[in-house]
Amino acid sequence: MIKGIQITQAANDNLLNSFWLLDSEKGEARCLAAKAEFVEDQIVAVSELGQIEYRELPVDVAPTIKVEGGQHLNVNVLRRETLEDAVNNPEKYPQLTIRVSGYAVRFNSLTPEQQRDVITRTFTQSL
């Protein structure tokens, strides 16, 4: 179980009023804020804190979700003719924005090679 604490008394003055997350299952403490000696996100064994007194703080721990091997899909709703016309007449499409690898990008800002690649990948005859 993880609990948040503020150290109120300690033999080490650098620990006074510092904030930590204590993981009782692992016997570890993660520094959230300290005057000196410890840095943010540093993990130490609870025993390294020495003799301390503390007050507990409310902590809302959100569950960590790990997704491995997922898939990614970019959706561009347009016609092939529109992109081909934008390659030949970029001045007609200054605001044409497409999705590439999760990012929105102006089609005209792509190199000619990248534009051809987008057209090839977006419009296929079969899967």
Swiss-Prot record:
Key words of the record: Organic radical
Modified residues (Glycine radical): 102
Gene3D superfamilies: 3.20.70.20
Annotated ranges, domain Glycine radical: 5-127
GO CC, one annotated term: cytosol
Highest taxon above the source species: Bacteria
A Pfam short name: Gly_radical
One MF annotation (Gene Ontology) recorded for this entry: formate C-acetyltransferase activity
Transit peptide found in the keyword field: no
SUPFAM superfamilies xrefs: PFL-like glycyl radical enzymes
Entry-linked InterPro entries: Auton_GlycylRad_Cofactor, Form_AcTrfase_GR_CS, Gly_radical, Glycyl_radical_cofactor_GrcA
Function: Acts as a radical domain for damaged PFL and possibly other radical proteins.
UniProt cross-references to NCBIfam families, sorted A to Z: spare_glycyl
Protein known as: Autonomous glycyl radical cofactor
Organism: Histophilus somni (strain 2336)
Name of the gene: grcA
